[in-house]
């Protein structure tokens, strides 16, 4: 039984914590374990984003927001919380769920059963805010037994726009910095406010057992659930420095353990419902 199928998992955290790297590794590991995976790059400020981490190709897919009419049609959820619609329809998209077959190939990058979408990027000065991209991240729910990973912008602004309303799990990536723990605590509280306890922290860039213990204790004091740890990985660090795709790395084994633990936690939750 694939516990994570039909789940939407949002990944957030402090800037520089390694969100996109972790999302790319989670996506590849889920694919390896037989899942059909959708990756949503919802970070308008990261020019390379997930595409750079997953592909050696030069040209990224077209912005997904254009399929829905661009920012001329898609509104910011803070100003207009109503559901998104298709470009030639006024019917709320949550009433007629998206089928992948209706989206032209130019809007996606595919690798076997993994499909990546870039919602949109800020490319020019004064072109406007990225609020409409947040609505796409909130409402883009695909028909079928996919697991969807949503890589949002750094910080917590996405909570203000309500992106988390349509997700099943929130994962917050925490690196060894004080600010990262502050954000993790806020994320846990805001997720709880929305009525969900399915929020867990993944410790990243852990370079020693001593640091890992300090980080775990800090999570405990702040009442943030711990899911797993990823050690500092030179291969990931080098790929980030050179702007290249992440190849094989030691972190993959840790990622597999994190996915297994998440499956077990959600399976236990289902048994108690």
Labelled PLM ranges:
Residues 31-111:
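N-terminal phosphate/diphosphate-binding loop that engages ATP/GTP or pyrophosphate donors
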Residues 89-152:
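Cytosolic-facing regulatory segments adjacent to core modules
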Residues 4-42:
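Walker A/P-loop phosphate-binding motif and the immediately C-terminal alpha-helix
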Residues 128-232, 237-238:
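Conserved catalytic-core segment of NTP-binding enzymes
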Residues 12, 221, 225, 235, ...:
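P-loop NTP-binding site
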Residues 8-10, 36-38, 114-116, 147-149, ...:
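Residue-level preference for the first positions of well-ordered beta-strands
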Residues 242-252:
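C-terminal boundary of histidine-terminating zinc-finger modules
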């Amino acid at each position: 039984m694939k516990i994570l199928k039909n789940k939407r998992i949002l990944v957030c955290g402090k800037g520089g914590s390694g969100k996109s790297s972790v999302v790319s590794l989670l996506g590849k590991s889920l694919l390896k374990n037989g899942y059909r995976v959708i990756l949503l790059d919802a970070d308008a400020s990261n020019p390379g984003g997930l595409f750079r981490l997953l592909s050696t190709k030069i040209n990224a897919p077209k912005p997904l927001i254009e399929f829905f009419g661009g920012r001329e049609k898609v509104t910011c959820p803070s100003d207009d919380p109503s559901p998104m619609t298709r470009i030639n329809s006024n019917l709320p998209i949550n009433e007629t769920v998206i089928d992948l077959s209706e989206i032209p190939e130019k809007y996606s990058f595919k690798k076997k059963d993994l499909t990546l979408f870039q919602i949109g990027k800020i490319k020019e000065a004064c072109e406007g805010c990225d609020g409409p991209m947040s609505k796409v991240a909130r409402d883009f729910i695909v028909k079928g037994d996919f697991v969807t990973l949503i890589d949002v912008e750094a910080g917590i602004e996405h909570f203000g726009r309500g992106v988390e309303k349509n997700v099943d799990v929130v994962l917050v990536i925490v690196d060894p910095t004080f600010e990262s723990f502050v954000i993790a605590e806020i994320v846990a509280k805001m997720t709880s406010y929305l009525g969900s306890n399915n929020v867990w922290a993944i410790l990243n860039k852990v370079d020693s057992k001593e640091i890992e213990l300090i980080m775990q204790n800090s999570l405990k004091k702040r009442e943030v659930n711990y899911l797993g740890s990823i050690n500092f990985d030179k291969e990931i660090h080098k790929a980030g420095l050179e702007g290249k795709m992440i190849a094989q790395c030691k972190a993959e084994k840790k990622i597999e353990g994190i996915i297994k633990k998440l499956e077990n936690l959600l399976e236990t939750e289902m048994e108690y419902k």
